[in-house]
Amino acid sequence: MTEFIPLFAVRRNYGDVSGTRSVYLTFDDGPNPFCTPDVLDVLTQHRVPATFFVIGTYVANQPELIRRMVAEGHEVANHTMTHPDLSRCEPAEVHDEVLTASRAIRSACPQALPRHMRAPYGIWTQDVLATSAKAGLAAVHWSVDPRDWARPGVDRIVSSVLAAIRPGAIVLLHDGYPPGEERSCTDATSRDQTVRALSYLIPALQRRGFEIHPLPQLH
């Protein structure tokens, strides 16, 4: 029987670990050749870092985007190899999903050293946490989810984040789609709402006194 883990047992925010009003931008389900470059362009324009939780099968096809992420100061993190519901996987499958994804990341860019892992769909089990820990990966969930994947509109994405943001918050956004849904992301318009929202959101957060930082490395 699968032992599910309550969300309070998984990292959802970082409090105020730096003594500043820090917040953390994270992106799931890339890299995607149509969407990810636009996200990176906005981050570069505003000179802020982010963490990209990437899917290993996409990494193998888009190594240049992984190298660009690292070159521009972003963290590349583990979102498994094929984005399955890990609660339906045997322990050996969980192990393979996590470790193979980390290998794919390092193969694409040896300078990329994954330090964090996020379970697909945010479904955590004891096997997932144990495997992540053994692989040296900190398990990270999120505390702010504007559901940008559903394309609710740019204004809704921005307002949802600003209404929920707190010091230490981890914001969930998307720069791609999971395997099986990738046909939904065949041009730059697929995540255009996320990209446009991001261009408004970053200065709005900064005006409110928040600082955008990389996810902390916990020892």
Curated annotation (Swiss-Prot):
Segments forming domain NodB homology: 21-213
Active-site feature positions: 28 (proton acceptor), 174 (proton donor)
Binding site for a divalent metal cation: 79, 83
EC number assigned by the record: 3.5.1.-
Subcellular location: Cytoplasm
Enzyme class at the top of the EC tree: hydrolase
Keywords linked to the UniProt accession: Cytoplasm, Hydrolase, Metal-binding, Nodulation
Signal peptide region: none
GO MF entry, a single one: metal ion binding
Family note: Belongs to the polysaccharide deacetylase family.
Protein name, per record: Chitooligosaccharide deacetylase
